[in-house]
Design a protein with these regions (language model features):
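N-terminal leader/targeting pre-sequences
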Residues: 2, 26-185
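Bacterial N-terminal signal peptides that target proteins for export
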Residues: 2-14
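Bacterial N-terminal signal peptides
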Residues: 12-23
């Protein structure tokens, strides 16, 4: 029987071991990623927190909101991590695909389109939902084609009115904003 030299066998064994452990290590790293974002109203009042947790299948979003008006509010991820007093610096909805706005439009929806948040009479809301296709940390890949962790970050926005899931302007003014700070920021 012909045998490869010992050093080649060791290198081959090390490469096999690395190949077998790399995917689980990457999954553990993605699972560990979490960001908590504080939201403020235009007048600087505390509007609660939103936690983003990276999972193996996308990002779990948990929002605990306060000091908002009763009723439905549009809730979106915006393209730029900036909240100026009028929140316009956050830009438009996060939309790397160039899709139409809204879950009810034939042209798809923005990656940053999220379900409405329903605020109770006491001004509070708690909701959680899942956002597939995104990651909190790079690198982008086929499984997670879009990252919220680009150089200028992203923002989470609560709008004054409910989203009709069709028209971009149906949610009204921007009521509260928080910055999803990039990892290097």
């Amino acid at each position: 029987m012909i045998q490869a030299p010992t050093s080649r066998r060791r290198i081959a064994a090390a490469l096999c071991a690395l190949a077998l452990t790399a995917p689980p290590l990457a999954a553990q790293q993605m699972q560990a990623a979490e960001k908590e974002v504080s939201l403020k109203t235009a007048d600087g009042q505390d509007a609660g927190t939103v936690t983003f947790e990276q999972t193996e299948h996308g990002v779990l979003v948990v929002a605990q909101l306060r000091n908002l008006s009763r009723g439905p509010h549009g809730f979106h991820i915006h393209e730029t991590g900036a909240c100026s007093p009028d929140f316009k610096a956050a830009g438009s909805h996060y939309d790397p695909l160039g899709a139409e706005h809204g879950f009810r439009t034939p042209g798809g929806y923005h990656v940053g389109d999220l379900p409405n948040v329903h605020v109770s009479e006491d001004g509070t809301a708690m909701t959680e939902f899942f956002v597939p296709q995104v990651t909190l940390t790079g690198p982008e890949n086929d499984r997670y084609p879009f990252t919220l962790d680009d150089s200028d970050g992203s923002a989470i926005m609560v709008h004054a009115s409910g989203d009709d899931y069709i028209r971009m302007d149906s949610s009204g003014d921007r009521a509260a904003c928080g910055v999803i700070v990039p990892s290097g920021g």
